[in-house]
Amino acid sequence: KGMAYANTVKAYPFGNEYMQLSGGKHAMLSEEKLDQFQKIYDLCDRNGIRLVLLTVPSANTWNKGKSDTVKQLAKKYDLTYYDYNRQLPAGFDWATDSKDGGNHLNYTGASAVTKDLAKKLTDDLTMSPTSLTKEQKQQWKKDYEHFHKSIVK
């Protein structure tokens, strides 16, 4: 729920080369962004919620410098960071998994990331796969079926 469905394919032809484009420079986070992050971190901490940082593959908007900055932030706050730009999920292929040449993922790309993230959350962080009630699971299934019927038209 929330992904703009796209099964179109426009390949990104350069593989993971984009991760070398920062020239070794770290990206700077503005004071405003750092303040907002601190608020989120504090809210999670007060409520016993484990905060996890995640970046999804985006060849047109991401680079090594940005990745390094988030990695430093994760280290400073002792957070888990899953960087899918440095480590693409199993089965992910820039030739087939982007809808617009590397900026956004299509359905197959998003599915590869989602499947890998679910495995990491359950294996690495020992999260339970779901705590949905039977009724909630039925509603998700109904919504899922409706979603797929509406896009097949």
Provide a role label for each language-model segment.
Residues 1-47, 134-153:
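Secreted/periplasmic serine-hydrolase-like ester/acetyl group-modifying domain
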Residues 7, 16, 47, 60-63, ...:
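Detector for Asparagine
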Residues 20-23, 27, 53, 96, ...:
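A near-ubiquitous, low-amplitude feature marking generic local secondary-structure context
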Residues 28-31, 57-66:
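Acidic-and-aromatic substrate-binding clefts and catalytic sites of carbohydrate-active enzymes
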Residues 64-153:
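C-terminal regions of proteins
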Residues 40-62:
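Active-site segments of SGNH/GDSL-like serine hydrolases
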